[in-house]
Amino acid sequence: MTSDVLPADAVASAAGNAHKPHLEQRPGRLTALVFFAVLATGLLFSAYSLMQDVDDVGSTITTWTPFLLLGVALLIALGFEFVNGFHDTANAVATVIYTHSLPPHFAVVWSGCFNFLGVLLSSGAVAFGIIALLPVELILQVGSSAGFAMVFALLIAAILWNLGTWWLGLPASSSHPLIGSIIGVGVANALMHGRDGTSGVDWGQATKVGYSLLLSPLIGFACAALLLLALRLLVKNRALYKAPKGKAPPPWWIRGLLILTCTGVSFAHGSNDGQKGMGLIMLILVGTLPMAYALNRTMPADQAVQFAAVAEVTQQALVKSAPQPAPADPRQVLSDYVRSKQASPELIPALAALTGSIGQEVKGYGAFSRVPAEAMGNVRNDMYLTSEAIRLMDKDGVGRFDADTRGKLQAFKQKIDDATKFIPLWVKIAVAIALGLGTMVGWKRIVVTVGEKIGKPHLTYAQGASAETVAMLTIGAADLYGLPVSTTHVLSSGVAGTMAANGSGLQWKTIRNLLMAWVLTLPAAILLSASLYWLLTRLF
């Protein structure tokens, strides 16, 4: 009995006769008008929401300089997400375009809409995971000149690298240069203050993020290849393994599968990648307008009462574990520990003292919304140091607390995170608009590379569906665990994996370029951001 599955050489032959999609059609005037209308509306909405938040806290504006710096920083951060949109999301639409499942411009708009929804419905876990990589002293003083230099340096470095790889048509990662830029700023900051360069980065967090970025293309390649082989074994419909004929769309069920996976990748990309910009925007807002954004002022008053109660029992447990007197400056002890990861005998008493101090302050105010504007920044900084110290102590096994004390510490950390790790709706909307509109600009270069230059023959339906499915699930899983991952690397390596599994052949010139970009991105971004940080600290 013969199998109904097409042999690999037959698939390759059929793929070679496929018709390429027409990508040169320009959008009409109405499309351009809608694009700029949405862009203008988003900017005006963001500006209005920002001013409304400042008005709500009753703060008097004495100088417009912080708002000018804030505006520039926010535009650069949103610019990063805009570039991220057309740089990364082109990968999501390449398969539906090259299989004629959707017309090119409709596919791009469709992807942009689901990127938008992905950002709006994201959890925020990735956003604050990115911030944890930054040097602690710059996080605590992000509103200073050095803090602005940090933000400008890492964002400009990431944008320049993304634009460079896009210009060359390379589907390189947008996450890689951002992580490299953060590391570069941390190393430069440490060296400029006379410390070992490695002390400027939380290498435990950086390693965790690095594994997710470095392993994701390998996962994409292997899993997409295995999924294609499993499809050939289990699904006997020959139409699935053919390349498109002419400009005709595929059978309805194949078309639906490809559109579904494209939609899933777009949504997952928005949910994961959009958070990187949100995290940096929140860092900027907290540094420049702490009275409005340092603490979540929308939390009900009973949450403040619970916060104070948990702080009190946590302090008592810590004092019981280490009854020695608290140091004169507990904040400095915790700051030194968070920066150096070296525990001193004063660490636990310092943590107990600061925990009690935070609890008493919140209890005295009665609600987070009643914390005075001039105290907001200090209260948040104390909370940040306490939360990070608890996280690192738990990770490193410092203190050897009993189960009850560990539980109280984690409960208090969760209360702190609830009060400090929040993202206003307008920030999500602004990032969603930037990422969604970016999806609709400049996508052709990357689409051509993914659709034509990775494998020798034309992409088949099964190959497109396999690569997209693996990308969707991988990015979704990373988002669930709060890890940044590269949509580009997962999907382009998935396409390569299906070509290899099918015996179709790879275009090794493109593969070499992709590997070179993969290897060079981190060191190049580190060097570029470190240089920019040094230069900007001299100018500010």
Where are the model-predicted features located?
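Helix-loop-helix hairpins and the membrane-proximal interhelical loops
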Residues: 9-76, 128-149, 236-248, 405-460
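Low-complexity, proline/glycine-enriched hydrophobic segments characteristic of transmembrane helices
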Residues: 17-20, 50, 54, 290-426
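Interfacial loop-to-transmembrane junctions
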Residues: 23-28, 458, 502-526
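Transmembrane alpha-helical segments of multi-pass membrane transport proteins and ion-pumping complexes
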Residues: 74, 78-89, 115-128, 154, ...
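Short, non-helical or kinked segments that cap or interrupt transmembrane helices
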Residues: 86-97, 101-104, 168-180, 274-281, ...
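Membrane-interface alpha-helices at helix entry/exit sites of multi-pass transporters
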Residues: 100-113, 461-465, 503, 507-514
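Hydrophobic alpha-helical bundle architecture
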Residues: 167, 451-487, 514-518
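Glycine-rich, mobile lid/loop segments that gate access to catalytic sites or pores
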Residues: 171, 179, 183, 187, ...
